[in-house]
């Protein structure tokens, strides 16, 4: 009688052996937010009083609707602030690695600052920075 070799290879049995930890991590990461939301829904204080459902702002009850129009000047200041805030975000890593970057990065940073100075002069001439 001839022995028939088994078709089962040991390498194919452990094909997913590297993914068990990842799968467990994925399951835990999916369950934690669901359990946290369920626990907060079950453990929260139950209050049926209507006074607790009203909004509270600076010690006074709000009067009127919430849809009011803001002045356009607020948006202009916010826009100029965002522009120069983004400038700071881009210039900070450059300043940290200034010695390693060399002359080309210094010239590029000067061009970037020049463009932002032109934007500041433009906003100044358009009177976007004046509150009148």
UniProtKB/Swiss-Prot annotation:
EC number(s) per entry: 7.1.1.-
Principal localisation: membrane
Catalysed reaction equations from the record: a plastoquinone + NADH + (n+1) H(+)(in) = a plastoquinol + NAD(+) + n H(+)(out); a plastoquinone + NADPH + (n+1) H(+)(in) = a plastoquinol + NADP(+) + n H(+)(out)
Enzyme class: translocase
GO BP term, example: photosynthesis, light reaction
Annotated InterPro entries: NAD(P)H_OxRDtase_bac/plastid, NADH_UbQ/plastoQ_OxRdtase_su3, NDAH_ubi_oxred_su3_sf
Record's bilayer topology term: Multi-pass membrane protein
Molecular function terms from GO: NADH dehydrogenase (ubiquinone) activity; quinone binding
SUBUNIT field: NDH-1 can be composed of about 15 different subunits; different subcomplexes with different compositions have been identified which probably have different functions.
Functional description taken from the UniProt entry: NDH-1 shuttles electrons from an unknown electron donor, via FMN and iron-sulfur (Fe-S) centers, to quinones in the respiratory and/or the photosynthetic chain. The immediate electron acceptor for the enzyme in this species is believed to be plastoquinone. Couples the redox reaction to proton translocation, and thus conserves the redox energy in a proton gradient. Cyanobacterial NDH-1 also plays a role in inorganic carbon-concentration.
Assigned protein family: Belongs to the complex I subunit 3 family.
Protein name: NAD(P)H-quinone oxidoreductase subunit 3
Taxonomic lineage from the root: Bacteria, Bacillati, Cyanobacteriota, Cyanophyceae, Acaryochloridales
């Amino acid at each position: 009688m001839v022995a028939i070799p088994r078709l089962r290879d040991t390498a194919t049995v452990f094909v997913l052996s590297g993914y068990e930890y990842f799968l467990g991590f994925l399951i835990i990461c999916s369950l934690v937010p669901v359990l946290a939301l369920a626990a907060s829904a079950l453990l929260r204080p139950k209050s049926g009083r209507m006074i607790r459902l009203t909004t509270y702002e600076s010690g006074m009850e709000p009067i009127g609707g919430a849809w009011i129009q803001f002045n356009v000047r607020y948006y202009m200041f916010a826009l100029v602030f965002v522009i120069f805030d983004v400038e700071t975000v881009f210039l900070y890593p450059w300043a940290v690695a200034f010695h390693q970057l060399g002359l080309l990065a210094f010239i590029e940073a000067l061009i970037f600052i020049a463009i932002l100075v032109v934007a500041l002069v433009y906003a100044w001439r358009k009177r976007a920075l004046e509150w009148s």
